[in-house]
From Swiss-Prot:
The gene is murB. This is UDP-N-acetylenolpyruvoylglucosamine reductase. It comes from the Bacteria. Pathway: Cell wall biogenesis; peptidoglycan biosynthesis. Its cofactor is FAD. Residues 23-194 form the FAD-binding PCMH-type domain. It holds the Pfam family FAD_binding_4. It is found in: Cytoplasm.
Length: 346
């Protein structure tokens, strides 16, 4: 990495523009990170000594429940390139501050498909491994090669492979033991040269059929376009209505528990997993409990997608968490299923 350089710290920094819920909270200190050297300088600056650090990219997967008494690192690292290729795949590196959707679009434009099912997911490249983002039959970990990160406590640069990242369903090492310990600076993806479409989800298949591709093998661009169309139809724009996308993970239950649920609820939406367990559609469970479109204080459940909690104007992070807890209690009482929140709550 480059040698440290000085950079401005901003006191009493407003975080409302930097979280997609639009919570009106502030940080004690903040600085914008555009280079490796600036990151090192921020970590070593005596003004931030002893302060808690929070890394923000797009702010699309965080619930801020109050002012942050520490240093916020606004990651704006840019750059994307093919670092190598072999007979089987391209290896593409992107800096952590790159917009995720724009990166996916770029890989397609460069003739390197493989990420199209993850189009239009909000946030940055650096946030993708933390959450192990996924949608419509693909998880990021399936295209992951490695990442570079800086340890907050020491400023040491490390390179981590998939094993060290311990990816799970919307989970990783960075949400568990590694939480608040690292700043991801770049991610390298492995995009296979032998491509096969993943168009099995009903919404995607229906959208492809609507544009005359129901019986044809879709191209990567066609799947990209279908995913974008479906997401825009179902999910609110966070710049218009504050939200963090899907708020709850789809719960996975044992086969016996699913059979008992299906006997009582024959219309339950489910997806059989390779290990025999069954993934349930959290949105369906929430809708069945009557929460779709409801409001609690200034927080609410979106009218078209029950998985999405929204800020209807002036809501606090505490109000959103209170709404989430009420939903979790109702789902647990009716179905005996525990819903887990996707965003990081601070």
């Amino acid at each position: 990495m480059s040698q440290p350089e000085s950079l401005p710290f901003i006191a009493d920094f407003p975080l409302k523009p930097h979280n997609t819920f639009g919570f009106d909270v502030r940080a004690r200190l903040a600085c914008r990170i555009e280079t490796d050297a600036q990151l090192l300088a921020a970590l070593r600056d005596p003004r931030a000594a002893g302060l808690r650090r929070l890394v923000l990219g797009g702010g699309s997967n965080v619930v801020l429940t109050g002012d942050f008494d520490g240093l916020v690192l606004l990651v704006a690292l840019r750059g994307r390139k093919v670092v190598r290729e072999d007979d089987e795949a391209w290896y593409v590196e992107a800096a952590a501050g790159e917009n995720w959707h724009e990166f996916v679009s770029w890989t397609l434009a460069e003739g390197m498909p493989g990420l199209e099912n993850l189009a239009l997911i909000p946030g940055t490249v650096g946030a993708a491994p933390i959450q192990n983002i996924g949608a419509y039959g693909l998880e990021m970990c399936e295209r992951f090669a490695s990442l570079r990160a800086v340890e907050l406590a020491t400023g040491k640069l490390v390179e981590l492979g998939a094993g060290a990242c311990r990816f799970g369903y919307r989970d990783s090492f960075f949400k568990q033991e590694g939480r608040e310990r690292f700043v991801i600076v770049s991610v390298t993806f492995r995009l296979p040269k032998v491509w096969a479409p993943r168009a099995g989800y009903t919404d995607i298949a229906r959208q492809l059929a609507a544009v005359g591709l129901g019986d044809a093998t879709p191209t990567p661009q066609a799947i990209f376009d279908a995913v974008v169309a479906v997401r825009r139809a179902k999910l609110p724009d966070p710049f218009v209505l504050g939200n963090a996308g899907s708020f709850f993970k789809n719960p996975v239950v044992e086969s016996a528990q699913f059979d008992a649920l299906a006997a009582k609820e024959p219309e339950i939406v489910s997806y059989r997993q390779a290990d025999g367990r069954v993934k349930l559609a959290a949105g369906w469970l929430i809708d069945r409990c009557g929460w779709k479109g409801r409001t609690l204080g200034a927080a609410g459940v979106h009218e078209r997608q029950a998985l999405v909690l929204v800020n209807r104007g002036g809501a606090s992070g505490t109000e959103v968490l209170a709404l989430a807890k009420a939903i979790q209690q109702d789902v647990a009482q009716r179905f005996g299923v525990e819903l887990e929140a996707e965003p990081v709550c601070l």
